[in-house]
Amino acid sequence: MTIPNSIPITPELVASHGLKPEEYDRILQLIGREPTFTELGIFSAMWNEHCSYKSSKRWLRTLPTTGARVIQGPGENAGVVDIDDGDCVVFKMESHNHPSYIEPYQGAATGVGGILRDVFTMGARPIAAMNALRFGAPDHPKTRHLVSGVVAGVGGYGNAFGVPTVGGEVEFDERYNGNILVNAFAAGLAKSDAIFLSEAKGVGLPVVYLGAKTGRDGVGGATMASAEFDESIEEKRPTVQVGDPFTEKCLLEACLELMKTGAVIAIQDMGAAGLTCSAVEMGAKGDLGIELDLDTVPVREENMTAYEMMLSESQERMLMVLEPSKEEVAKAIFVKWGLDFAIVGKTTDDLRFRILHQGEEVANLPIKDLGDQAPEYDRPWRESDKRGPLPANLVDEPADYRAAILSLVGSANQSSRRWVYEQYDTLIQGNSLQLPGGDAGVVRVENHPTKALAFSSDVTPRYVEADPFEGGKQAVAECWRNITATGAEPLAATDNLNFGNPEKPEIMGQLVEAIKGIGEACRALDFPIVSGNVSLYNETNGVAILPTPTIAGVGLLPDWSRMAKIGGAQDGDHVLLIGTDGTHLGSSIYLRDLLGRTDGPAPEVDLHAERRNGDFIRSAIRNGQVTACHDISSGGLGIALAEMAMASAKGLTIDLSESRGPAHALLFGEDQARYVVTVPADLANFICANAEGAGVPFRRLGKVGGDALVIDGVCTIAVEELRNTHESWFPNFMDGKAETLAAAQ
């Protein structure tokens, strides 16, 4: 269907483009006339939440974004952090939530493709990927179909492109029944003096289109990603993009080759809102206008209109400002890789965004008002209600501790994710040192004998719902802790803030308070936010998701031969708890999964204790004093011990007699800033003395050996039984076995 440019602009048409009446009035005021249909589409794309961050920008500015190692913070395609020796790591996390619910395979695949492009647009070769996935209740009729499609899409794209998936999360909760979350992370390596930015420079320079041809897929995708869902959701399927990882691999190689020639003045990938967003961002950042001639855009469908070409989200495309003298060199590279190379416009000095099509000017708009001066809102918000304390003595103990531990390790949310990550290529490129299933993924830095990078992605949405401020702090602290548990120094983070409708003050309040908590934790832990993404309107029929501010972080290991793993325990090692005894059962999985309760406050995050305990752990690991390390998070000490026993295939004999408090709080309390370590017997006294000297709380828990987890006076479980229970839930669920669904309920 061909859409003419002269469609009358009605209030219904404006509303269907996601623009509020007052926003349309502002457009009329800005341009002094009624917009053309193409112009309406451009405003709709650039002024939606997905591109403008209009509800969150005010609060995002409060986050710490600088640090001794930060080369490039937010505002570019990805963040850039120095890792010494002239190397840097380039990384970002981004959501592809709405498309993945509508079309799970392509939605997830193009989410991976988009984040990889963000990284190599900066001049970095991708070396690692992660994904944080949230699905509805296991017994919801759509959940299994969505899990299957999303996991296949993530694997299908990442594996074919050739990047290892080294970590991530998969969780289930009924609050995601109508809106799943697909948060994709990628990191790449570059030289610190060879980073490419998107800010256009110079007047009259060619604007070049690179990559795959433009089709009608994804038209209006950014607008869809900024709206709530309702019953008409199936009609939105055409707004999901289609990805081709082989084309993207060629685009990566062509771009990196091109970047060595000096031809690139500025470069931007085409993601949300396609050609519109990339051209506007490049021009607005450089205080330049952009003129495009759509007759020169490579297309793969006939009779495409200006509206469709400007808003198509076809994948594997880039836009760049070219050094004119290098045109032939640049073109030859793209022809060699079988990709399109077309000069589609030029930079101008008039700050206008002009679009020509078939000899007609179809758009002429002020570029700054579309880009960095788009509307910004200070939406009303209110603080979340505070939950009262929930002392452990008011929470029932399990009748059978053995059954309780087995039930948790074999539950929907605590069971092994092997079924998922075995569909991902975790070893491609040959540098993976730690694979999914531990605290953090670790990848060796190519061409360096000892250096490696650690990656983790974390958030506990039930904590954020209970207390957005503490939950925001906890997401940062757990990510920092997981990186620390390998022995790496946490360098910086990227955030992916997934929330409901910001026009509701209680939802806006969750976002504001979570950002405040994230900011406080990042400052206390020297863990700046260097890139990120906000996904709002994750609601269906007025029901919002759990607030989910995902934090993904990167850490540096100067010598990977000294790193710690969750499964390194040796017979005869001593088991130590670093941190305080467990006390906190509010908002815990023990409470939720065994007692069916979701009450109680989130655990408090003492950032001073996090820093002190984490620095102590890292130092002990780097000094070669630790054989295995695991942070304590969901499920508390009991689940951490079970996971260590399974990972090392060794028994643990644990004595809680020195610990203070009821056994269910000691074993299932989710107090923060805690680790379990195993240490050689001859170093145990030395490490305990060091902890005492550093003011770090610790407990001697027991020893490694045998083939069972023995918690003295509480329970005994064979490691083999733990592992069978842990490994069976996911495959049984995906096979549709009824007892798995019953257990999940």
Curated annotation (Swiss-Prot):
One of its GO terms (cellular component) is cytoplasm. It catalyses: N(2)-formyl-N(1)-(5-phospho-beta-D-ribosyl)glycinamide + L-glutamine + ATP + H2O = 2-formamido-N(1)-(5-O-phospho-beta-D-ribosyl)acetamidine + L-glutamate + ADP + phosphate + H(+). The active site is at H50, H96 (proton acceptor). Mg(2+) 2 binds at D118, D269. Substrate binds at S95, H96, N97, H98, R117, Q241, E313, S314, Q315, S535. GO terms for biological process: 'de novo' IMP biosynthetic process. One of its GO terms (molecular function) is phosphoribosylformylglycinamidine synthase activity. Mg(2+) 1 binds at E94, N533. This is Phosphoribosylformylglycinamidine synthase subunit PurL. It comes from Allorhizobium ampelinum (strain ATCC BAA-846 / DSM 112012 / S4).
